[in-house]
Structures are given as C-alpha cells and as structure tokens.
Swiss-Prot record:
Keywords: Developmental protein, DNA-binding, Homeobox, Nucleus, Transcription, Transcription regulation. This is Homeobox protein Hox-B13a. GO terms for cellular component: nucleus. It comes from the Eukaryota. Belongs to the Abd-B homeobox family. It comes from Takifugu rubripes (Japanese pufferfish).
Length: 320
C-alpha cells in the first residue's frame, strides 16, 4: 500500500509530502516500535508513521527521529484505505516536544513546494514541530517531486497558487484585482457639430454591473433586459424605413409604373385586333419594333383580355 501525506504548515516553510510503502499492519508495528523506543510517551502522536520506508522510497538516507521544543501546527487529514473509508479528526498531541519523521527534500536555494501529491491507499494524520524537518540535498527527491506533482510552485506563492484554482467560485474571495470589462467604453464617440446624431444599433449604456452576493472581486456585466435584441432589430428596421420615406433613392417595393407611348399602344392594339393570343414570332417582332421586352408584351395582352372581359360583362349586366 502506498500512503501519501501533504503537510501545509501555517508558517512559511516547504510543503512536505510523505510517501510510505507499507500496509496497515506494518504501520501499526512501526508505531508500536516507536512507542517502545522510549523517546516519547504512548499518548503522544500515536498516528505518526514510520519514516524508514519513505526514506528508502524517496532515495533519501534514513535517520532517527528529531525532537522539537517549538510549537507545531495541527494537520487534520481524512484517513482512507483500499477496503473502507474512515474519517479521522487527528489525535491531538500534548503540549511539549513531538517527534516527526525526517523527510529528504531539496535545499533551501532550490526549495519547491508540492501542491499536488500522489494519494495511495492510506492517509493518516499527524502533528509536526516547526523545526522538526531536516534538510538534505538529494537528487532523487527532485525526481520524485516531478513524478508526484503536476506543477511546481514556490512555497511563498503556494497560497496564491491555490487561490487561482478557486478564483471562479462565488464563495471564494478573490485576491486579485478586478479585470476591466469589455463593455465599459461606449462604441460611439462624440460626433461633429454638423453631423446628425443617430442612436447606435447596440447601445452599450444598457449594461449595468451585476453585484454578486458571496463576494467576487471583479464585476460582471449583463443586460437589463435579455429580450431586448428583438426590440433593437425592430427599431433598426423602422429607422431604415423612415429614411427611405424621406426621399432616399434606395427605396424598396414596386417599380414605378411607366406608361406606354402612343406608338407602342398603336402597335399592340393592331396586333390584338388581329389575334387576341399573340404567338412567339409575333411577340419577337413587336418587341423589336416597340423597344419593349417580350414579357411586357405578354403581360399587356393578358391585361387587355381581362379588360375586354370585364367590359363585356358590364355591358351584359346593363342590358335589359
């Protein structure tokens, strides 16, 4: 079983990761051996683990326990195993010296924190003194640090590094400055004196800060009315129609009716008197003579037949 433990002390120090290659029975035997050695009482730090296997696994040199008379911080860790999951609050050590395992790590000049660690089948709590860590320069420690971690962050930047991971949660206070919004500045600048001022298609003044209750450092901008897009498009189209009615040449709709000349009407009436349904050859001939398109000639013949039909129906209705 591989057991990992990450200790983050409350003072500026390197974060330490313990890796133990023992099962639960071996750990209990090692703890009983530590109690029987006479260095400390059985009531002190019963959950501390043996360091011999960790030193061998990390490539460090095994050494004895180091006593410390200074105060130490408590690390409460959840204890888990491969078969069951236990929750341990961490037994409190009595006031006084508390031994801690010697862990090999890099020197102070190249000290690296271990924000991420490899968690095995077991996880146990213990308490350590501030000065109980012994420094030694081992190359294997750096190799295993890169193996059991994703990124390398300095110890003084560890809190800020962890804060970045929770910066986007509402309940986590952000230690960073608020970012400038993309919608802070209006798009339309001041116009000249002679230029007419028109409203923008997408006005930016409709965005207001969205205050978060649980405390983000920055501000988010959202529209007051989410259903405003349709209104904007309708107003824009209405503006275009208004400009068209003002006399603009770019006016949509039906083409302006151009009346036929007397020469064109004479030629069309002559052909209609001969045949009410014009043929293809006749249509091409009249088109060349009157400078009209074949489609115009076809439509004129259709309208002329309808006009005659209405006239005949009106005459019949007026007859006694």
């Amino acid at each position: 079983m591989t057991t990992s433990l990450v200790l983050n002390p409350r003072w500026p120090a390197d974060t330490v990761m313990f890796v133990y290659e023992n099962n639960l029975d071996d750990l209990n035997k090692n703890m009983e051996g530590l109690v029987g050695s006479g260095n400390f009482a059985a009531s002190q730090c019963r959950n501390i683990m043996a360091h011999s296997a960790a030193a061998a696994a990390l490539g460090g040199h095994p050494s004895g326990l180091v006593h410390s008379s200074t105060g130490y911080s408590t690390v409460d860790v959840t204890a888990t195993s491969s078969n069951d999951t236990l929750t341990s609050s961490g037994k409190q050590c009595a006031t006084g010296p508390c031994p801690a395992a010697t862990v090999p790590h890099q020197s102070s000049s190249a000290a690296t924190a271990l924000p991420y660690s490899y968690f095995g089948n077991g996880y146990y709590p213990c308490r350590m003194g501030r000065g109980s860590l012994k420094s030694c320069t081992q190359a294997a420690g750096a190799a295993l640090s890169s193996q059991y971690m994703d990124t390398t962050v300095n110890s003084d930047e560890y809190s800020n590094h962890r804060a970045k991971e929770f910066a986007f949660y509402h309940s986590y206070p952000s230690p960073y400055q608020s970012m400038a919004s993309y919608l802070d500045v209006s798009v339309v600048q001041t116009l000249g004196a002679g230029e007419p001022r028109h409203d923008t298609l997408l006005p930016m003044d409709s965005y207001q800060p969205w205050a978060l209750t649980n405390g983000w450092g920055g501000q988010m901008y959202c529209s007051k009315d989410q259903g405003q897009a349709g209104h904007l498009w309708k107003s824009a189209l209405a503006d275009v129609v208004a400009h068209q009615h003002d006399g603009s040449p770019f006016r949509r709709g039906r083409k302006k009716r151009i009346p036929y000349t007397k020469v064109q009407l004479k030629e069309l009436e002559k052909e209609y008197a001969a045949n009410k349904f014009i043929t293809k050859d006749k249509r091409r001939k009249i088109s060349a003579a009157t400078n009209l398109s074949e489609r115009q000639i076809t439509i004129w013949f259709q309208n002329r037949r309808v006009k005659e039909k209405k006239f005949v129906a009106k005459v019949k209705s007026n007859a006694p």
